[in-house]
Amino acid sequence: MAGNTIGQLFRVTTFGESHGLALGCIVDGVPPGILLTEADLQHDLDRRRPGTSRYTTQRREPDQVKILSGVFEGVTTGTSIGLLIENTDQRSQDYSAIKDVFRPGHADYTYEQKYGLRDYRGGGRSSARETAMRVAAGAIAKKYLAEKFGIEIRGCLTQMGDIPLEIKDWSLVEQNPFFCPDPDKIDALDELMRALKKEGDSIGAKVTVVASGVPAGLGEPVFDRLDADIAHALMSINAVKGVEIGDGFDVVALRGSQNRDEITKDGFQSNHAGGILGGISSGQQIIAHMALKPTSSITVPGRTINRFGEEVEMITKGRHDPCVGIRAVPIAEAMLAIVLMDHLLRQRAQNADVKTDIPRW
């Protein structure tokens, strides 16, 4: 009921708030015998970590993860893995002025309507700080998928504001602060971010995540279709307002003769479906996109009300990302990895003995 857990066989439960003592999660369903250290998780956490560039929030959290359980002598035991990250750079005083004010565009109003109270410090549980634990759990899934099945999961920024980005060079993604795969657009992104900082405003973004090497057959029709669970996972990320699989909404303008992915003896001739047909993976690349809204934490004055119903004007103080899509890349990778690992374990549990003579590419 509380909505803090995702997955069925590979289950991730997170806890913690933005300005609490710590963030944590419990990861169930990890097979025994996997080599696992804190360093295996730290790489992706460092990619998501705040304060790593001038384009993201200057809250400086080391995000050093601790493995509390489920690993003995560097090997998973098959029991629950407990993970913890301590919060070290909270500045709760930045939020004392808004404890009775609902920030427009944030979850303040809805959390108070639901629970009758809220942790106003940095958004509490609704803060994207919670996603650090998703990234830690997702790193376990990414390691297992890569080592046992050769599955690779990569994400990148594919649009910021009105600047579209082409996936020209995956190796470039880790070499610039925008997770940008398009060398021709990095200067334009830098210029846009500088302008936003000067204006005190923010901008939306689009993130694309791709999984390669996924075997055919993952997905549980009808309600646990693979694309449905991917959409569920990506939509659960803060600020995400839309998810597309494959060509997504672009299929509206296509005809069936254009959209169908024809098959020859050499394999699929296109991938408009994004690697999923009938809710089941086809063996092609799984491609998903998500749209993230511009954060409402800006210094441009805006109208709202306080808890007494009085209209007030407010400016959001604190340290915030002018484009939340940048740090969402490793989060999207983690959520896709969590879903794929869960479905892979479910497929093996039910259909491990299934053999077909149908070609696979």
Curated annotation (Swiss-Prot):
Keywords for this protein: Amino-acid biosynthesis, Aromatic amino acid biosynthesis, FAD, Flavoprotein, FMN, Lyase, NADP
Entry-linked Gene3D superfamilies: Chorismate synthase AroC
Pathway(s) where this gene product acts: Metabolic intermediate biosynthesis; chorismate biosynthesis; chorismate from D-erythrose 4-phosphate and phosphoenolpyruvate: step 7/7
Cofactor binding note: Reduced FMN (FMNH(2)).
Residues where NADP(+) binds: R48, R54
EC number(s) on file: 4.2.3.5
Catalyzed reaction equations: 5-O-(1-carboxyvinyl)-3-phosphoshikimate = chorismate + phosphate
One Pfam family from the record: Chorismate_synt
Cofactor: FMNH2
Gene Ontology CC: one annotated term: cytosol
InterPro entries (alphabetical): Chorismate_synth, Chorismate_synth_AroC_sf, Chorismate_synthase_CS
GO term, biological process aspect, one: aromatic amino acid family biosynthetic process
Ligand binding (FMN): R125, S126, S127, N238, A239, G278, K293, P294, T295, S296, S297, R319
Molecular functions (GO terms): chorismate synthase activity; FMN binding
Record flagged with keyword Transmembrane: no
Task performed by this protein: This reaction introduces a second double bond into the aromatic ring system.
Complex formation: Homotetramer.
Annotated HAMAP family: Chorismate_synth
Family label: Belongs to the chorismate synthase family.
Record-given protein name: Chorismate synthase
Organism name: Shigella boydii serotype 18 (strain CDC 3083-94 / BS512)
Taxonomy of the source species: Bacteria, Pseudomonadati, Pseudomonadota, Gammaproteobacteria, Enterobacterales
